[in-house]
């Protein structure tokens, strides 16, 4: 019983991420409106800041109409599975120095596992709807996720080779001298492309291509189930993948400025722990917000590509490049270490 309560408590601790998702939808709309030279949402609340809550209330109050021949249980279960596994990844993220929900040595492996399991929710939702558009969208999404998850694992393998650890806190602390984005800049660019494809975002949103599949695997979902699928699960995955990118390549909660501002004044006698944790969390938030902005920027700038082009780029261009890096980079590092020892 105690174990069950502990598991439920740790899961509930991930729910504040849903509030971040609400404001992310607002910021995306306002950013895209600015890029397209229009006003965007500005009616509900001050400067339109309550628009996401109004949309959520509208979807909650709508009647849910399920397809006649659909498997109702799996149709409901698919979005819920996707949302649960999208939120579970937040448990192992170090939000600051000593500020985390759970910290264990296989943190990055845990995130890869739960992100892979979210694919089953998409597959269930598409198959159980008894609709050709939803089924084709779920098949596309599954093929796309499997392909680009393979790439992400190779990219993360390089970071593990640099640090020798699967612990996210250790990976962050290993970047005190230099962020990994500098020696691994080409890897980071390809990794970020893989992250966009992993989250089904434009220009890789082929699983829900409106011109081909209506709304893909979400075609037959409406009301609160659509809100779980689109507003919550998808945007929670975007925030999680941006946090993971900042942890792996941008130093996570490490200070953005070259100066160690934590030691500018003596805070040992007054709120030292709270101040340091707050500053470190702010650093992570700024880096994550920048990556989310790049997500939105890419969506507003590039048209959707064809599905065969997406898969071809993955298997014929990006995968050979990353395999070459995985083989050559350790050889270069070992060679440099040997030459230094000889000197």
UniProtKB/Swiss-Prot annotation:
Q: What is its EC number?
A: 7.1.1.2
List all membrane-crossing ranges. 4-24, 70-90, 106-126, 154-174, 177-197, 224-244, 278-298, 316-336
- A molecular-function term among this protein's GO annotations: NADH dehydrogenase (ubiquinone) activity
**Location in or out of the cell:** Mitochondrion inner membrane
Which residues are connected by disulfide bridges in this protein? Answer: none
Catalysed reaction, written as an equation: a ubiquinone + NADH + 5 H(+)(in) = a ubiquinol + NAD(+) + 4 H(+)(out)
A biological process from GO: aerobic respiration
Topology in the lipid bilayer: Multi-pass membrane protein
Keyword ATP-binding on this protein?
no
> Per its record, how is this protein called by name?
NADH-ubiquinone oxidoreductase chain 1
Question: Lineage in the entry?
Answer: Eukaryota, Fungi, Dikarya, Ascomycota, Pezizomycotina
């Amino acid at each position: 019983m105690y174990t069950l309560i502990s598991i439920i408590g740790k899961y509930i601790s991930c729910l504040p991420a849903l509030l971040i998702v609400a404001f992310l939808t607002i910021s995306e709309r306002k950013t895209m409106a600015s890029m397209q030279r229009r006003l965007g949402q500005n009616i509900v609340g001050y400067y339109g800041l309550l628009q996401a809550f109004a949309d959520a209330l509208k979807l909650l109050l709508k009647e849910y109409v399920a397809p006649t021949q659909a498997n109702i249980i799996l149709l409901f279960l698919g979005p819920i599975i996707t949302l649960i596994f999208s939120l579970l990844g937040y448990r192992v993220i170090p939000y600051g120095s000593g500020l985390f929900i759970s910290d264990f040595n296989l943190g990055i492996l845990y995130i890869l596992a739960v992100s892979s399991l979210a694919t089953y929710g998409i597959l269930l939702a598409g198959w159980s709807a008894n609709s050709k558009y939803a089924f084709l969208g779920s098949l596309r999404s599954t093929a796309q996720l499997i392909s680009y998850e393979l790439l992400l694992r190779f990219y993360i393998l390089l970071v593990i080779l640099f640090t020798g650890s699967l612990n996210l806190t250790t990976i962050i602390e290993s970047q005190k001298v230099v962020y990994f984005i500098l020696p691994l800049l080409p890897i980071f660019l390809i990794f970020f492309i893989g992250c966009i494809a992993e989250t089904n975002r434009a220009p890789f949103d082929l699983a829900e291509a409106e011109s081909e599949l209506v709304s893909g695997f979400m075609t037959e979902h409406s009301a609160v189930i659509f809100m779980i699928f689109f507003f919550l699960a998808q945007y929670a995955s975007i925030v999680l993948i941006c946090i993971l990118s900042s942890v792996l390549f941008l130093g996570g909660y490490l200070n953005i400025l070259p100066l160690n501002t934590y030691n500018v004044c003596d805070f040992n006698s007054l709120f030292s722990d709270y101040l340091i944790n707050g500053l470190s969390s702010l650093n992570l938030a700024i880096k994550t917000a920048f990556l989310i902005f790049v997500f939105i920027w890419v969506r507003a700038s590039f048209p959707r590509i064809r599905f065969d082009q997406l898969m071809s780029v993955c298997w014929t261009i990006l995968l050979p490049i990353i395999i070459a890096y995985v083989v050559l980079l350790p050889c270069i590092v070992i060679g440099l270490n040997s030459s230094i020892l000889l000197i």
